[in-house]
C-alpha cells in the first residue's frame, strides 16, 4: 500500500469556535472494492460526528461528489464541497493503486474482487485535547495495519503489512498523521459541532421495554430493548437480586435506527416462572435517572373475559337507557298518548329502536 493512502482527510485547520465541551468524536470510514471486468473499483467515504453520518462520497453515483447527509452541513459554502470532492477523488485514485499493490504483496491473481477498508479519526475530551487518534486498515476482512495508541508506531498484521509499515516508517507517516490528529482533526470536529449544535448536542432518552421469548427445557429468554435514543452511548445490564449478570447476558452492538437515533438490546436466559426476579437497568444521559424494568406478563384469559363481560353489560345498559329516553321523549311530544305514534309500513319495532339508538349514541359521542 502506498503512503498516499494516509491522505484521506483535509489537513487545513480552522479557527477555533466555541461550543459545549465534552467527549466527542470525528471518524471517517473508507471502502474500496475492486471488480475486475466491471470497470474501476468502487470507492466510498463516509464521515461521522458523534456517530451521526454527516457527509458521504460514492464513486458510483451519477455525479460523484462529497454530499451532506444532514441539514446543518448545508451551511457550508460551495468552496468547501468542491475541496472535499476533490480530496475524495484523490483518495479514490490512491486506493486504486493500493489495491494493485496488495495483489502483488499477497501474490494474488487479477481476476478476483478484493476490498480495502479504513478508518481514521479523533476522540476529544472535555478540555478539547486529543484522547485517542485512529488510523487502521483491513484487507479482505482481516486487519492489515493500524496506528498504535502512542501515535508513533504501527502494528502490522502479517508479512505483507510489514512491507507497508517499513515504507510508512521511512516516509515519517506517523509524524504527519499525529500532527493532523492533534490539530486539524480536533479543529474540524469543533467546527462541525458548532454547525450541528442544535442536533448533535441534544439528547433523546431511550424508550425501553422487556420482551418474553419461550425456549425449550423450562427456560425463557428475556430481552431488554432500548430504542430511539441519542447519543449512542448507553448501558444495558441485567441483574438478579442486585447482582449484575454481565457474563451471562447477550449484548448486541449499538445500531443506528435510520432516523438519527440508535437502538440496542440485552438478552438473558432465565428459568421459566422466575422472570420477575430479574431486572433490566438502563443508563443514558438523556434519562433523569436510570430505568429499572421487569417483564410484565400480559393479563390472563380470565381477566380478559371479565373485562369483556363488563363491557357487554355496560353496553346493554346504555342501549336500554337510550331506548327508554327516546320512548319517553316521543310520549311527551304526543301528549303522553302512545296511540299517536305509529311505525312505518313494513317496519318492526326492534329494528326502528335499534336504528334510533345508534343515531343517539353517535350524536351523544360527537357532543362529548
Swiss-Prot record:
Residue ranges crossing the lipid bilayer per the database entry: 304-330
GO cellular component, one term: phagocytic vesicle membrane
Topology relative to the membrane: Single-pass type I membrane protein
Keywords: Disulfide bond, Glycoprotein, Immunity, Membrane, MHC I, Phosphoprotein, Signal, Transmembrane, Transmembrane helix
GO BP: antigen processing and presentation of endogenous peptide antigen via MHC class I via ER pathway, TAP-dependent; negative regulation of neuron projection development; positive regulation of T cell mediated cytotoxicity; T cell mediated cytotoxicity
Region (Connecting peptide) location: 296-303
Region of interest (Alpha-1), ranges: 22-111
Chain segments carrying region Alpha-2: 112-203
Cytoplasmic face of the membrane: 331-368
One Pfam family linked to the record: MHC_I
Places the protein is found: Membrane
Topology Extracellular: residue spans: 22-303
Predominant subcellular localization, coarse grouping: membrane
Cleavable signal peptide: 1-21
Region (Alpha-3): 204-295
Family annotation (InterPro entries): Ig-like_dom, Ig-like_dom_sf, Ig-like_fold, Ig/MHC_CS, Ig_C1-set, MHC_class-I_related, MHC_I-like_Ag-recog, MHC_I-like_Ag-recog_sf
Disulfide bridges in this chain: 122-185, 224-280
Residues carrying sugar: 107, 197, 277
Residue positions where Phosphoserine is found in the record: 350, 353
Annotated Ig-like C1-type domain residues: 206-294
Record-stated family: Belongs to the MHC class I family.
Function of the protein: Involved in the presentation of foreign antigens to the immune system.
Subunit structure as annotated in this protein's UniProt entry: Heterodimer of an alpha chain and a beta chain (beta-2-microglobulin).
Name of the protein: H-2 class I histocompatibility antigen, D-P alpha chain
The species this protein was found in: Mus musculus (Mouse)
Amino acid at each position: 500500500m502506498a503512503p498516499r493512502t494516509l491522505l484521506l482527510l483535509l489537513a487545513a485547520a480552522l479557527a477555533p469556535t466555541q461550543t459545549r465541551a465534552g467527549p466527542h468524536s470525528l471518524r471517517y470510514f473508507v471502502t474500496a472494492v475492486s471488480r475486475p471486468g466491471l470497470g474501476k473499483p468502487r470507492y466510498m467515504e463516509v464521515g461521522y460526528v458523534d456517530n451521526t453520518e454527516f457527509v458521504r462520497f460514492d464513486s458510483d453515483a451519477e455525479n460523484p461528489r462529497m454530499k451532506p447527509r444532514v441539514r446543518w452541513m448545508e451551511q457550508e459554502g460551495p468552496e468547501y464541497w468542491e475541496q472535499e470532492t476533490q480530496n475524495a477523488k484523490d483518495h479514490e485514485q490512491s486506493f486504486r493503486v493500493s489495491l494493485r499493490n496488495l495483489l502483488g504483496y499477497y501474490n494474488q491473481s487479477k481476476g478476483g474482487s478484493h476490498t480495502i477498508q479504513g478508518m481514521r479519526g479523533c476522540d476529544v475530551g472535555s478540555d478539547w485535547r486529543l484522547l485517542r487518534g485512529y488510523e487502521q486498515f483491513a484487507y479482505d476482512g482481516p486487519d492489515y495495519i493500524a496506528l498504535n495508541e502512542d501515535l508513533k508506531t504501527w502494528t502490522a498484521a502479517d508479512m505483507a503489512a510489514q512491507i507497508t509499515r517499513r515504507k510508512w516508517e521511512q516516509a515519517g507517516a506517523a509524524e504527519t498523521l499525529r500532527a493532523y490528529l492533534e490539530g486539524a482533526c480536533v479543529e474540524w470536529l469543533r467546527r462541525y459541532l458548532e454547525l450541528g449544535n442544535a442536533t448533535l448536542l441534544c439528547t433523546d432518552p431511550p424508550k425501553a421495554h422487556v420482551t418474553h421469548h419461550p425456549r425449550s427445557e423450562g427456560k425463557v429468554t428475556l430481552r431488554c430493548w432500548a430504542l430511539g435514543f441519542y447519543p449512542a452511548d448507553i448501558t444495558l445490564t441485567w441483574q438478579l437480586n442486585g447482582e449484575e449478570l454481565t457474563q451471562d447476558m447477550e449484548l448486541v452492538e449499538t445500531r443506528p435506527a435510520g432516523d438519527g437515533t440508535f437502538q440496542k438490546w440485552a438478552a438473558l436466559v432465565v428459568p421459566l416462572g422466575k422472570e420477575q426476579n430479574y431486572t433490566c437497568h438502563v443508563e443514558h444521559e438523556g434519562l433523569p435517572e436510570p430505568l429499572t424494568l421487569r417483564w410484565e406478563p400480559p393479563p390472563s384469559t380470565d381477566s380478559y373475559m371479565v373485562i369483556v363481560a363488563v363491557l357487554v353489560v355496560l353496553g346493554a345498559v346504555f342501549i336500554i337507557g337510550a331506548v327508554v329516553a327516546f320512548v319517553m321523549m316521543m310520549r311527551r311530544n304526543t301528549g303522553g298518548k302512545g296511540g299517536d305514534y305509529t311505525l312505518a309500513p313494513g317496519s318492526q319495532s326492534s329494528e326502528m329502536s335499534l336504528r334510533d339508538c345508534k343515531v343517539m349514541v353517535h350524536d351523544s359521542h360527537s357532543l362529548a
